[in-house]
Amino acid sequence: MAELGLNEHHQNEVINYMRFARSKRGLRLKTVDSCFQDLKESRLVEDTFTIDEVSEVLNGLQAVVHSEVESELINTAYTNVLLLRQLFAQAEKWYLKLQTDISELENRELLEQVAEFEKAEITSSNKKPILDVTKPKLAPLNEGGTAELLNKEILRLQEENEKLKSRLKTIEIQATNALDEKSKLEKALQDLQLDQGNQKDFIKAQDLSNLENTVAALKSEFQKTLNDKTENQKSLEENLATAKHDLLRVQEQLHMAEKELEKKFQQTAAYRNMKEILTKKNDQIKDLRKRLAQYEPED
């Protein structure tokens, strides 16, 4: 790390920008100097001037210098915005979110540090040449947090990519060997079939037709049997349902007949006589029990 706390690559980028800014600053200073020189050559030709003439000359010079300085300041601000845009665009390609601290731009200590760095860069006689002329990509700015995780993930993916390449190469070799072996086996099989062609006949078309007819007949018979069983099952289910209904109807008729028989029996003379006799017998039994109770000794 150098004086600004940056690595060599970023320090070279800072030096390039400082050279660019110094060049633009020099051009603007020359423009301001030319304003004064033009004033001297065009207006200061008399030996004496009145107060109004001096005031007019100074006002004109002030307007020109003000315009030049304002133009330079505006251009510098726009240039800084373009520089930040480049950095942010590169950071977004790495899915990074950079942050800036505006208050640090007015830190006198840091500004003096930059000034000393510029002086050292100007006076240094052994500056390293900047060989990298290609457009760089912004690397992670710190070694922790999201940037560190992203860097580790990139390294892991690179290692995995190398492993996959090696594995793919191995698989390609195995596939090539397998294809060669397959070709050899196919050729051997063709040779064997040609050798057996004169010794053994294959299935004839007629045999195949007979086999198809037999299969069709078996299918038809099976379907017929299946249909018969289905019809028999349906018939049995219908008969069972009919029998259940008949059984319920007979049970209901039997129950009604029993009720009717009991009702008719209760209406007969024999039933009434028997009921009357039973009533009398019960009364006699009650009377006898009362009499017996009178003769039983008391405890």
Curated annotation (Swiss-Prot):
One GO molecular function term of this record is:
identical protein binding
Q: GO CC terms on record?
A: cilium; cytoplasm; cytosol; manchette
Q: Supply the alphabetized keyword list.
A: Bardet-Biedl syndrome, Ciliopathy, Coiled coil, Cytoplasm, Disease variant, Obesity
Q: Quaternary structure?
A: Self-associates. Interacts with BBS9; the interaction mediates the association of LZTL1 with the BBsome complex and regulates BBSome ciliary trafficking.
**Highest taxon above the source species:** Eukaryota
This protein's name = Leucine zipper transcription factor-like protein 1
> What family does this chain come from, according to its entry?
Belongs to the LZTFL1 family.
What this protein is reported to do is described as:
Regulates ciliary localization of the BBSome complex. Together with the BBSome complex, controls SMO ciliary trafficking and contributes to the sonic hedgehog (SHH) pathway regulation. May play a role in neurite outgrowth. May have tumor suppressor function.
Oxidoreductase recorded as keyword: no
| Residue runs in coiled coils | 96-296
UniProt subcellular location: Cytoplasm
Q: In which tissues is it expressed?
A: Expressed in prostate, ovary, stomach, pancreas, esophagus, breast, liver, bladder, kidney, thyroid, colon and lung (at protein level). Down-regulated in multiple primary tumors (at protein level). Detected in testis, heart, skeletal muscle, thymus, spleen, small intestine, and peripheral blood leukocytes.
What pathology is it implicated in?
Bardet-Biedl syndrome 17: A syndrome characterized by usually severe pigmentary retinopathy, early-onset obesity, polydactyly, hypogenitalism, renal malformation and intellectual disability. Secondary features include diabetes mellitus, hypertension and congenital heart disease. Bardet-Biedl syndrome inheritance is autosomal recessive, but three mutated alleles (two at one locus, and a third at a second locus) may be required for clinical manifestation of some forms of the disease.
**InterPro entries the record matches:** LZTFL1
GO biological process terms, alphabetically, are: flagellated sperm motility; negative regulation of protein localization to ciliary membrane; negative regulation of protein localization to cilium; spermatogenesis
Gene name of the encoded protein = LZTFL1
Q: What ranges does the record give for the region Interaction with BSS9, renumbered to this chain?
A: 145-299
